[in-house]
């Protein structure tokens, strides 16, 4: 086996920050089974705390529930660097240098199979867009990510685990326990802003310090209860930040080269989701595991039709990842809000909801189909009167928050609640 990379192990360590790439339970266990769990000191995420806000910055409700298996986010610069060294240690040939279509053609002639897992500029357009399986043609969120340390954990102990802050229609923000290359335990902050909305302010950011200042301003305005936690934070390094947009796409898994030979695509090269559902690295890991088992058990040649059939077989389960990711990009339905509201009162419902990050198929159909949602809640003895009681509690809480802000207004002046 040969692995071709345009960067050395040291190049990866010196690279800019990479996406957060939080792996959930089954994928963490699979890496461990492969002997790739090199960072036992990295913080594990065992719970997720979600705050759902209204447009006037009021907290509607919170969901706090355990994950069935711990999640783990390790700096990809560490993982890619260690991975290259480990592949070589296990006997594979590692070749450093750029690879273009002509190189792929040459490699396809001398190897049983060539697998492409990167979509760099020289290979752009190699895999054809699947018009049926691709839902979006434009970015659905403006993205910003940075790693920070020096935050005030005492101000918000919830951040010992994962925290999600949602303002539907405006901003989703993820505060992820993270193992950073330079400082170790830190937090990776992932911002998903609705394009053109109040939180879409990162397009002109040119540095980590500038990005953090913009982020603090957004948090002060939209999630002020997080301000004390974030105020003393600083970037883990000048390069651990990313901004941009993603157009979710599914591509055909087999590309035909000019010679007529073919290559297989895996991971983001063929299935690229918006990071909102945290499925990029998880989806790539599931796909790699499936194809590793299929390829190892196949005695014949790896023909293009056979590879396409295997992808279709994988898609029977893999499509749930896309449906989950695209579903979260859409506005929350009334039934989904009801599930989340029930989860704020029932930890078992929250645990089932969080399991979707580990196994998206576990959310179907009950989280995306109204009738199935009602059946799901009924099986857990959450009836209409329970939901009504939950909603009345939320309403009373919102009124209390508004009254509190009115009381805090200065006499003889004006203030914005």
Residue locations for each model-derived region?
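C-terminal helical "tail/cap" subdomain of flavin- and related membrane-associated enzymes
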Residues: 277, 293-417
